[in-house]
From Swiss-Prot:
It catalyses: ATP + H2O + phospholipidSide 1 = ADP + phosphate + phospholipidSide 2. Residues 1-33, 84-268, 334-807, 861-890, 943-948, 1008-1107 are cytoplasmic. It is a multi-pass membrane protein. InterPro entries: ATPase_P-typ_cyto_dom_N (IPR023299), ATPase_P-typ_P_site (IPR018303), ATPase_P-typ_TM_dom_sf (IPR023298), ATPase_P-typ_transduc_dom_A_sf (IPR008250), HAD-like_sf (IPR036412), HAD_sf (IPR023214), P-type_ATPase_IV (IPR006539), P-type_ATPase_N (IPR032631). The gene is ALA2. It comes from Arabidopsis thaliana. This is Phospholipid-transporting ATPase 2. The modification Phosphoserine is found at S1050. Interacts with ALIS1, ALIS3 and ALIS5 in a heterologous system. Keywords: ATP-binding, Endoplasmic reticulum, Magnesium, Membrane, Metal-binding, Nucleotide-binding, Phosphoprotein, Translocase, Transmembrane, Transmembrane helix.
Length: 1107
């Protein structure tokens, strides 16, 4: 599909009637109420509560005033709707500001001032320096004589470096006067969200040009939300407007992620719903039987002789209404509120602010904080994520000679400096490729120095290194490049740029030497993308050895090459290149095919080696998280040896004898199958052995494994704690995440670049690092952090606390609802199983919304352990990963507690107040008071760290309960007139409260004391140590039970196995890190295995979906 945009012609562009109005609003003034209600009632639980509320309107079956259900329902829906309205109002204000911004357009040669929302497709938009681009434009002219302008794209892709944009070749030389009256047509694709591509063609009408077709790329565009910088003015024709711009198409509502805790809460809710139906059926049948056998014998109960057809449904429906409170109506609002607070805690954490850049952490997704505490696998990018992405040129190999090996710095290598001085041909060519085979822009600073603006850190490092070696890239004027070398000036004309792509893994520049007219191809790229295309007869073994050597040192390598072209060869190729560049369909593929025809018979000049240092705290972070039972997979596009050395240096894997690498390689299906089978066999054998085993696989072998041996690879994924996947593409990264998710593991993906976005979005939790490659990953992620080391605190502190708090909040919500419901059920047995409510409507309405909510919301600041203890003992994360605090077993405990407390409240209340002069309202108020007192003590008992706010909320809530009820007791029409005054004046009331609390909490406190004293968990021991102010415990102190084959944690002493299968492949012996971090046989080493290794040894307990 394509569209035609007519330049400066309103009539011809009428069919493209989309204006430039931006709308990110979800609602309008007229559809807000119906649309919001539709969204809320699309959820099953809300439909259920609405049905209950509607049944309450049937006076024959409702046991209480309908307001007791409609009140909380309306309140909760109003809270949700108000939040949506508030968010949408802010979106409206943002849209209004953007739409009403004034811009200049040119019509028929006349400038006009209009609002941005009135721009039409085909209008020529005029921009001045520092203006924001209001829509997607094709650049037509700039104030620069060479047709160049500079834009800042930070709002679009997060990259802060200025980028160059150039006018199409068809517009070069058109003066300002004619520019205003330009006519032509642009053939472009239909709107899409790909900000990296714009495959279009432009044809200007006479008298501007002779109808020649000019191809357009993304470099000829100015995209919406970019800013014009360092350019006096620029103008362009609008091709996409409004929500059809690339930015507008990128906007969208991300698919919500369901946390493991939410899934468990849904299952438990379903179980309670089934239990409720059973109770309703049993009591409904019992009620009808009692009515037919006993009630008609009572003289004071008058039933009609002939009952209507629905008579048998009345009592069951009445019990349905009575038991509907089993499922707490407030749980969703409560969880949404506390989850929002969890996100704010992350953003307010001053210890997660990058001091270098001032970047704070940010939670874009407020709904999944609990999943941080249940992470089992972390899949991480390497460059910019584990490393600093500060590239420094360290070594090189030119013509088989190694430079920089002695002192680790080629820039100070005397031999290299002598070669430059003597004019070595290979060295000069090598430096030339370093200097100009790139997209770097040299800019003159105010101090007169040359500053390089590069889109790639690698290119920046190479250009700077070349300048330090006297090959200085001085300036770029349109297609003319100027280099200064040893006092002489060299000029090149750029004929074509063969851009880098992830498939080609190289880039080339075709230049013409202005001194001798020679046409030269300069290339640089990965070794596998350059060396196979070396000219016949050239020995590349030394270059290959250099790549291998540098990779073993953890350095990033690029091969540089050179080829002189015949003019006829270039001209023939140029025609095909322009044809491919003008295609609208499959342009990228056809360009790559044409480039391949030129990039051959290359003369390999040498190899560069660039250092990318690890970020501060990376080894410590990975070591700590591995102790927490989290498995690590490194997914990188870098070379195998480089990735391995980085993995060694950052504690990703352990050197021999404690660590072992298994290689999966091969170029054919048969080779990969054999290698995979060999590694899988070894992993099965060593699954129960305490050895740190990891596997390594490259992108090619991974592609074959996923296509032909997916089941075996999935088994390997289950068995492996650590994996290093090299030379992988963005799509393969996402595939690996999906494989682990299919096995029901909770995954976290972390990266910093645009190539990590798919992986981040695919994972259960996506974390983006605000790095030097921009903010694309950070914007696509659920959480954004400034440094990798903050991941430790994000998981161990915020993730764990969030899990603990939500586990308590959700189960307590069910507990308090079940408690009141069980009392209603018990009361039915002494009221003829009629479905009569013990409590009045006001009490029921206030119970869930007010009386029992405040203490729970304050529990979001509760901490079972101090942050220091959590960070020092990461092994306790196991309780979250295993779901120990929220599961059917723990829920059964809360269920039993609610039943026990209901029995206590009911029995004591009945025995104390069931006498002739006691009113039913008094009985209900005594029972309700007992519930409130019990719940205050339950919250106090479950609270680990008391603050003034928590004391005020727990005990102040009790005071508030009495204040509210005294107020209602003073109102004659409330139905509670004088009840509270009468009760509180009776000593028996306070004795009853004391008995209820004593009988209800005594066994609970005794059970807790027994557990803490005689069967303490690791957390209990740490809590006792904190309270006593004792020394920091070691892991050995914590481990009180022998290891069982389950997802548990315990220290393991690892020794060198006596007999090692040939399948074991040693780590690189010449690695400096391996030497530095080597351990002798028998050295004890404490680490905690995750479920992946443990479960696999007992029949692979994970249920993987069919892949």
């Amino acid at each position: 599909m394509k569209r035609f945009v007519y330049i400066n012609d309103d009539e011809a562009s009428k069919e493209l009637c989309c204006d430039n109005r931006i709308s990110n609003r979800k609602y309008t003034l007229w559809n807000f109420l119906p649309k919001n209600l539709w969204e809320q009632f699309s959820r099953f639980m809300n439909q259920y509560f609405l049905l209950i509320a509607c049944l309450q309107l049937w006076s024959l079956i409702t046991p209480v005033n309908p307001a007791s259900t409609w009140g909380p329902l309306i309140f909760i829906f109003a809270v949700s709707a108000s939040k949506e309205a508030w968010d949408d109002y802010h979106r409206y204000l943002s849209d209004k500001k953007a739409n009403e911004k004034e811009v200049w357009i040119v019509k028929q040669g006349i400038k006009k001032h209009i609002q941005a929302q009135d721009i039409q497709v085909g209008n020529i938009v005029w921009l001045r320096e520092n203006d924001e681009v209001p829509c997607d434009l094709v650049l037509l002219g700039t104030s620069d004589p060479q047709g160049v302008c500079y834009v800042e794209t930070a709002a679009l892709d997060g990259e802060t470096d200025l980028k160059t944009r150039v006018i199409p070749s068809a517009c070069v030389g058109i003066d300002l006067e004619l520019l205003h009256k330009m006519k032509g047509v642009i053939e472009c694709p239909v709107p899409d969200k790909d900000i990296r591509r714009f495959d279009a063609n432009m044809r200007l009408f006479p008298p501007f040009i002779d109808n020649d077709v000019c191809s357009l790329t993304i470099k000829n565009t100015l995209l919406q939300s970019c800013y014009l910088r360092n350019t006096e003015w620029a103008c362009g024709v609008s091709v996409y407007t409004g929500n059809q711009t690339k930015l507008g198409m990128s906007r969208g509502i991300a698919e919500p992620k369901l946390t493991a805790m939410d899934a468990m809460i849904d299952k438990l809710t379903g179980a309670i719903f089934v239990f409720q139906i059973v109770v309703v059926l049993v009591l409904g049948i019992a009620g009808n039987v009692w009515k037919d056998t006993e009630a008609r014998k009572q003289w004071y109960v008058q039933y009609p002789e002939e009952a209507p057809w629905y008579e048998l449904l009345v009592i069951p429906l009445r019990f349905e209404l009575l038991c509907s409170i089993m499922i707490p109506i407030s749980i969703k609002v409560s969880l949404d509120l506390v989850k929002g607070l969890y996100a704010k805690f992350i953003e307010w954490d001053v210890e997660m602010i990058d001091q270098e850049t001032g970047t704070a952490s940010y939670a874009a997704n407020t709904a999944i904080s609990e999943d941080l505490g249940q992470v089992e696998y972390i899949l991480t990018d390497k460059t910019g994520t584990l490393t600093d992405n500060k590239m420094i040129f360290r070594r090189c190999c030119i013509g088989g000679i190694f430079y920089g090996n002695e002192n680790g710095d080629a820039l100070k290598d005397a031999q290299l400096l002598n070669a430059i001085t003597s004019g070595s041909t290979d060295v000069i060519r090598f430096l030339t490729v370093m200097a100009i085979c790139n997209t770097v822009l040299p800019v003159q600073s105010k101090a007169g120095d040359i500053v390089y603006k590069a889109q790639s850190q690698d290119e920046d490092a190479l250009v700077i290194a070349a300048s330090k070696l006297h090959m200085v890239f001085v300036g770029k004027n349109a297609n003319l490049l100027e280099i200064r070398f040893n006092g002489s000036v060299i000029r090149y004309e750029v004929l074509e740029i063969l851009e880098f792509t992830s498939d080609r893994k190289r880039m080339s520049v075709v230049v013409k030497d202005c001194q001798n007219g020679k046409i030269i191809l300069l290339s640089k790229g990965a070794d596998e993308a350059i060396l196979p295309y070396a000219r016949a007869g050239q020995q590349t073994r030394t270059i290959g050895d250099a790549v291998e050597h540098y990779s073993q040192l953890g350095l990033r390598t690029l091969c540089l090459a050179w080829r002189e072209l015949e003019e006829n060869e270039y001209l023939e190729w140029s025609v095909k290149f322009k044809e491919a560049s003008s295609l609208l369909v499959d342009r990228e593929w056809r360009i790559a095919e044409v480039c391949q025809r030129l990039e051959h018979d290359l003369y390999i000049l040498g190899v560069t080696a660039i250092e990318d240092r690890l970020q501060d705290g990376v080894p410590e972070t990975i070591e700590t998280l591995r102790k927490a039972g989290i498995n690590f997979w490194m997914l990188t596009g870098d070379k195998q040896n480089t990735a391995i050395q980085i993995a060694l240096s950052c504690n990703f894997i352990s050197p021999e004898p404690k660590g072992q690498l298994l290689m999966i390689d091969g170029k054919t299906e048969e080779d990969v199958s054999r290698s995979l089978e060999r590694v899988l066999l070894t992993m099965r054998i060593t699954a129960s052995e305490p050895k740190d085993v990891a596997f390594v696989i490259d992108g090619w072998a991974l592609e074959i494994a996923l296509k032909h041996h997916r089941k075996d690879f999935v088994e390997l994924a289950i068995l492996s704690r650590t994996a290093i996947c090299c030379r992988v593409t963005p799509s393969q990264k996402a595939q690996l995440v999906e494989i682990l998710k299919s096995c029901d593991y909770r995954t976290l993906a972390i990266g910093d670049g645009g190539n990590d976005v798919r992986m981040i979005q695919q994972a259960d939790i996506g974390v983006g690092i605000s790095g030097r490659e921009g903010l694309q990953a950070a914007r696509a992620a659920d959480y954004s952090i400034g440094r990798f080391r903050f991941l430790k605190r994000l998981i161990l502190v915020h993730g764990r606390y969030s899990y603990n708090r939500t586990a308590f909040l959700s189960q307590y919500s069910f507990y308090k609802s079940l408690l009141i419901c069980f009392i209603q059920i018990f009361f039915s047995f002494i009221s003829g199983v009629s479905g009569t409510s013990l409590f009045n409507s006001v009490s029921l309405m206030a119970y869930n919304v007010f009386y029992t909510s405040v203490p729970v919301l304050v529990s979001v600041i509760d901490k079972d352990l101090s942050e220091a203890s959590v960070m020092q003992h990461p092994q306790i994360l196991f309780y979250c990963q295993a779901g120990r605090l929220l599961n059917p077993s723990t829920f059964a405990g809360w269920f039993g507690r609610s039943l026990f407390h209901a029995i206590i409240v009911f029995v004591i209340t009945i025995h104390a107040y069931a006498y002739e002069k006691s009113e039913m309202e008094e009985l209900g108020m005594v029972a309700l008071s007992g519930c409130i007192w019990l719940q205050a003590f339950v919250v106090a008992q479950e609270t680990n760290s008391f603050t003034v706010l928590q004391h005020l909320s727990i005990w102040g809530n009790l005071v508030g309960f009495y204040a509210i009820n005294f107020l209602f007791s003073a109102i004659p029409s409330s139905g509670m007139y004088t009840i509270m005054f009468r009760l509180c004046s009776q000593p028996s009331y306070w004795i009853t409260m004391f008995l209820i609390v004593g009988a209800g909490m005594g066994p609970i406190f005794a059970l807790k004391y027994f557990r803490y004293t005689y069967r303490p968990s690791k957390i209990n021991i740490l809590q006792q140590a904190e309270r006593m102010g004792g020394p920091i415990l070691t892991l050995g102190n914590i481990e009180t039970q022998p290891r069982t084959i389950e997802k548990d944690l315990s220290p393991i002493s690892i020794t060198q196995p006596k007999n090692r299968s040939p399948v074991y492949e040693p780590l690189l012996s010449d690695s400096p890190n391996a030497t530095r971090r080597s351990f002798g046989p028998g050295t004890p080493f404490e680490f905690f295995q995750s479920q992946s290794r443990l479960s696999s040894s007992s029949g692979y307990t994970r249920n993987c979906k069919d892949n």
